[in-house]
């Protein structure tokens, strides 16, 4: 169909306007859904939702049962946006099918149908029900007969009084299909009144029917009879896809029948099928095509069985397989628009345009649901809906058809301003303006029309393809596009550059761990192009910031050299230098092999174990690009300090060997093994340890060491040794064999010590002579046998303790804190042992003997000084001898009183006077207090300042004269002497070296004395009138 020029101009304008404003036909966001309104609800309105988007915004109208709803005339209806509000819904007027229409300037769409129903439940008619008489053992069905209602119901039965409901079990069943109560076998306890209770699942309203009395007949008990199926499902039952299907089945009979289910074709039930209410209900959730077929309910008791059969058929409402999609096309084109749905039965199709049935004509046809329109024009634009329906439902799919008419326009898809390519390459210059219908295109280079030739082709989409580009192809290219509505043009500058070349490429390298290298990558490129370098390692782009510790790009603007520092094994692999410009890219690759010490061997296993050997095997780890030349085996036990190298056979394990025998192991010890590989680079990491294994048992081979003994109590022979370490015991059940005999006797006495940790054995016998020599040896044994004995050594039996007390005990005080005790030695025979010494026990007269203190002295001493005593206090003491066998009796007790303490007052006002080499000292007399010892004299202590040896001068006067050499400082102090010891020292006085013929001083002048620097020998002479 040809259009006039006026129509063309108008269509072009409309197409441009539509593009500018982005107009869009209505699209539903919300559609109404089926609703059930409870009659008598407190809510006095119901809302049916409808919302659509579009530009311009849609407006709405509604239909009920195909007739328009005029909200301006009927005030029970109100529109809120697109939502329809029904005020005070009435089941007589408002029940039916509702549809929403959304319209804007581009067209109209219709919503799916939404059914509004009203749920109600009326009361039972008030009439008495006849009583039901049955014999005991007979089955019975009590009918419910629900009142008029709308909406789904649930049923229950009350026994006698509400709310005592009948409990369902294998004997009693309430059908949710019929509402009836089924009792398979009546018992006397069933007698009573039964009331049917009906509940609306929508409104929750509940009504009760009239009671039905159930009584027993008096003509006897019903005998046994085979099952009679009273409740069964239909012979044919359609089931919707995805629904939950419930089949009920119940039988009367005596005994009470057992209900079972099966498929007639013998196929087992899938796991989703559930049996409920004591098998009275078969439930199939999410019903699918494979669940169709014949099902059987079998009721069986001891008198026989009965079977009910029914077939489930499958149906599915239509559902979309392919939805409509918006179409935008040009005038005079053809349209093929397909929507596809599935369902059972197979859906049929019809189409709407702007809410009305599509009118078919010669160029508009529908076939198998697909719409075809030939020679499109703008008036074909609008909103289209495909409806798929079968007897179970219908569905809608909506889309917009835009038929465009416009002149070529490059604004939406402009041509590239510049394209850069290299000499010899292929380039395509695009020319894709928007145009309806599609524009025809031709090209110009400068002012010259481009013609097709061997290297140049005009493409069907309007593009220009140039192969094997040369420098002469560079220039400005213009595409001129034209259709019946107008024409437009666009330009592209083609820039032709020289190709980029790598002039110094990286090469394969072989390095060792820890080295640093540079992989070169230098290029020659067109100066018009910016260049960028990138390195890939094993296909991954190198991040120089993240991996800067190892990788760095070095070189100038035309170089992308890669420096790799401190190379590690992980750096082995393929390196690619990628050079990229705006028009091309080149790359070059090199392999880097990094050699290092080998990785740990793997799968170390102990294949065979004996008492002293272990057969090992392992597999090779990574060789780190350097072949393994040797292996070493290490072992660890609970007794070793870390891992130790062990001996193997072969002694030297070469790099091709994967097995070795470890020798010289200790029996009955738990070992772990590991293997270390070495190559010419060095030793690698050790393998993971093998599993722990224990060597087999063997007889012990090591005897105890340090065998000795002695001591103990009378009539004992004590034998000691160092226990054999656990790792040398060679097996379980380890112990010691102790052998001994008196010196000169040939027969050994043997005994066993079963504890491997026991280092001692004591032999007791009254016949043992004290301190007699024995030959002793200690051997070993375990579960596998006996081992060697230690060398024979001599051990003496226990000594005899002393039996005599020391005699002639005496004690006298030495000072205020010391008492000397003396005694005579006891008579002693060497055959009785060795006398170790004496023990002196002492206590004061205020203490108890049991809490006494003790002092021990060697056996050759006959006196002891007790120190640290309290002053002026009587102490009691006794002495006894002792040896290794024990201690003898104590001597008689003696006592002595410590002297009073020395005076606490030091000699005061010490003054000195030096003449020539003489020094005259004077001091004040010290007077003792009542509780202090009397002063018996004084001691003058003096030494040179450079020596520590102190000289002492005793005197009973308060003065002393010293003859001292010159040229030396002297330190002097004075103490009082008493029977209780020396008193408190005076302050030290320093006498400087004598440099003049006359000098004097006192203790108050000490701080003015300067130290001397020389050292001379001290010659001390003193002249005193001492009385001794």
From Swiss-Prot:
Region (Disordered), start-end ranges: 684-714
PANTHER family in UniProt: CONTACTIN 3B-RELATED (PTHR44170:SF18), PROTEIN SIDEKICK (PTHR44170)
Lipid positions (GPI-anchor amidated serine): 1002
Subunit structure of this chain's protein: Interacts with PTPRG.
UniProt signal peptide: 1-19
Localization annotation: Cell membrane
Disulfide-linked positions: 50-100, 144-196, 249-297, 339-386, 431-479, 521-577
GO biological process assignments: cell adhesion; neuron projection development
Stored SMART domains: FN3 (SM00060), IG (SM00409), IGc2 (SM00408)
Residue stretches making up the Ig-like C2-type domain: 26-117, 122-208, 227-313, 318-402, 408-497, 499-593
Similarity comment: Belongs to the immunoglobulin superfamily. Contactin family.
Tissues of expression: Specifically expressed in brain. Not expressed in peripheral tissues such as heart, lung, liver, spleen, kidney and skeletal muscle. In brain, it is restricted to subsets of neurons such as Purkinje cells of the cerebellum, granule cells of the dentate gyrus, and neurons in the superficial layers of the cerebral cortex.
Residue ranges constituting the Fibronectin type-III domain according to the UniProt record: 600-698, 703-800, 805-901, 902-998
Gene symbol of the encoding locus: Cntn3
Job description of the protein: Contactins mediate cell surface interactions during nervous system development. Has some neurite outgrowth-promoting activity.
Carbohydrate attachment residues: 65, 193, 377, 468, 489, 538, 765, 860, 895, 913, 931, 956
GO cellular component labels: neuron projection; plasma membrane; side of membrane
Protein name: Contactin-3
Propeptide: 1003-1028
């Amino acid at each position: 169909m040809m259009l006039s020029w006026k129509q063309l101009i108008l269509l072009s304008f409309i197409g441009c306007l539509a593009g500018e404003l982005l107009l869009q036909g209505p699209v539903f966001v919300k559609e109404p859904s089926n609703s059930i309104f409870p009659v008598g609800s407190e809510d006095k309105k119901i809302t049916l939702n409808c919302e659509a988007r579009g530009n311009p915004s849609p407006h709405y109208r509604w239909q009920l049962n195909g007739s328009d709803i005029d909200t301006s005339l009927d005030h029970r209806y109100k529109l809120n946006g697109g939502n329809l509000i029904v005020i005070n819904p009435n089941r007589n007027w408002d029940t039916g099918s509702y549809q929403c229409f959304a319209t804007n300037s581009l067209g109209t769409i219709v919503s799916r149908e939404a059914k509004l129903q009203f749920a109600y439940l009326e009361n039972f008619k008030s009439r008495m029900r006849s009583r039901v008489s049955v014999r005991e053992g007979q089955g019975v069905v009590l009918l419910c007969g629900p009142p008029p209602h709308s909406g789904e119901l649930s049923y229950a039965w009350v026994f006698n009084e509400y709310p005592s409901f009948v409990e369902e079990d294998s004997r009693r069943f309430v059908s949710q299909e019929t509402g009836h109560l089924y009792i398979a076998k009546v018992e006397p306890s069933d007698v009573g009144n039964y009331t049917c209770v009906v509940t609306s699942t929508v409104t929750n309203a509940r009504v009760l029917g009239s009671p039905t009395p159930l009584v027993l007949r008096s003509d006897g008990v019903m005998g046994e009879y085979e099952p009679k199926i009273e409740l069964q499902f239909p012979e044919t039952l359609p089931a919707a896809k995805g629904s939950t299907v419930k089949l009920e089945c119940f039988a009367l009979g005596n005994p009470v029948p057992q209900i079972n289910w099966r498929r007639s074709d013998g196929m087992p039930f899938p796991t989703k099928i559930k049996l409920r209410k004591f098998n009275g209900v078969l439930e199939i959730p999410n019903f699918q095509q494979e669940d169709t077929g014949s099902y059987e309910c079998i009721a069986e008791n001891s008198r026989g069985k009965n079977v009910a059969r029914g077939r489930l058929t499958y149906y599915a409402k239509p559902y979309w397989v392919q939805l409509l999609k918006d179409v935008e096309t040009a005038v005079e084109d053809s349209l093929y628009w397909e929507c596809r749905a599935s369902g059972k039965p197979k859906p049929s199709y019809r189409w709407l345009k702007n809410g009305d049935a599509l009118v078919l004509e010669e160029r508009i046809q529908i076939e198998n649901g697909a719409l075809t329109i030939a020679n499109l024009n703008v008036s074909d634009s609008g909103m289209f809906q495909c409806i798929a329906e079968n007897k179970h439902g219908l569905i809608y799919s909506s889309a917009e058809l835009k038929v465009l008419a416009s002149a070529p326009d490059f604004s939406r898809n402009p041509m590239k301003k510049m394209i850069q390519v290299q000499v010899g390459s292929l380039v395509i210059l695009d020319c894709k303006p928007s145009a309806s219908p599609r524009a025809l295109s031709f090209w110009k280079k400068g002012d010259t029309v481009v013609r097709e030739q061997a290297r140049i082709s005009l493409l069907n989409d309007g593009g220009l393809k140039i192969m094997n580009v040369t420098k002469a192809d560079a220039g400005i290219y213009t595409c001129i596009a034209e259709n019946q509505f107008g024409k437009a043009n666009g330009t592209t500058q083609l820039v032709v550059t020289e190709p980029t070349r790598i002039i110094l490429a990286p090469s394969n390298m072989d390095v060792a761990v820890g080295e640093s290298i540079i992989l070169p990558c230098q290029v020659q490129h067109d100066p018009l192009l910016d260049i960028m370098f990138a390195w890939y390692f094993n296909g991954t782009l190198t991040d120089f910031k993240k991996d800067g510790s190892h990788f760095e790009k070095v070189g100038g603007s035309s170089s992308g050299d890669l420096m790799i520092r401190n190379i590690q094994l992980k750096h082995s692999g393929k390196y690619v230098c990628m050079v990229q410009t705006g028009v091309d890219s080149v790359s070059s690759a090199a392999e880097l092999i990094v050699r290092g010490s080998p990785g740990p061997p793997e799968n170390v296993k102990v294949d065979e174990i004996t008492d002293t050997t272990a057969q090992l095997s392992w597999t090779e780890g990574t060789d780190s690009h350097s072949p393994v030349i040797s292996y070493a085996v290490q072992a660890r036990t609970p007794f070793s300090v870390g891992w130790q190298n062990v001996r193997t056979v072969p002694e030297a394990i070469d790099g091709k060997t994967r097995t070795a025998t470890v020798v010289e192991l200790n029996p009955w010890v738990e070992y772990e093994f590991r293997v270390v590989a070495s190559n010419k680079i060095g030793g690698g990491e050790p393998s993971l340890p093998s599993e722990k294994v224990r060597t087999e048992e063997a007889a012990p081979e090591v005897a105890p060491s340090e065998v000795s003994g002695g001591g103990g109590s009378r009539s004992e022979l004590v034998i000691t040794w160092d226990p054999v370490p656990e790792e040398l015991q060679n097996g379980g059940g380890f112990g010691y064999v102790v052998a001994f005999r008196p010196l000169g006797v040939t027969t050994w006495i043997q005994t066993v010590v079963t504890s491997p940790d026991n280092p001692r054995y004591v032999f007791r016998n009254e016949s043992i002579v004290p301190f007699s020599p024995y030959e002793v040896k200690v051997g070993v044994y375990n579960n596998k046998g006996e081992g060697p004995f230690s060398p024979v050594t001599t051990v003496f039996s226990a000594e005899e303790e002393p039996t005599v007390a020391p005699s002639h005990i005496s004690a006298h005080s030495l000072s205020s804190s010391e008492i000397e005790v003396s005694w005579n030695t006891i008579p002693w025979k060497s055959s009785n042992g060795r006398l170790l010494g004496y023990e002196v026990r002492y206590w004061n007269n205020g203490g108890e003997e049991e809490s006494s203190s003790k002092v021990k002295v060697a056996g050759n001493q006959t006196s002891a000084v007790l120190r640290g005593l309290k002053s002026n206090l009587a102490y009691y003491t006794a002495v006894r001898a002792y040896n290794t066998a024990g201690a003898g009796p104590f001597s008689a007790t003696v006592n002595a009183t410590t002297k009073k303490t020395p005076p606490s007052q030091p000699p005061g006002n010490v003054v000195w006077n030096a003449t020539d080499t003489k020094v005259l000292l004077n001091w004040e007399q010290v007077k003792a207090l009542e509780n202090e010892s009397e002063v018996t004299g004084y001691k003058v202590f003096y030494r040179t300042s450079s020596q520590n040896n102190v000289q002492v001068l005793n005197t009973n006067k308060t003065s002393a004269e010293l003859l001292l050499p010159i040229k030396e400082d002297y330190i002097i102090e004075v103490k009082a002497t008493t029977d209780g010891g020396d008193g408190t020292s005076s302050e030290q006085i320093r006498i400087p070296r004598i440099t003049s013929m006359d000098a004097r001083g006192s203790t108050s002048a000490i701080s003015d004395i300067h130290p001397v620097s020389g050292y001379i020998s001290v010659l001390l002479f003193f002249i005193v009138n001492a009385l001794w």
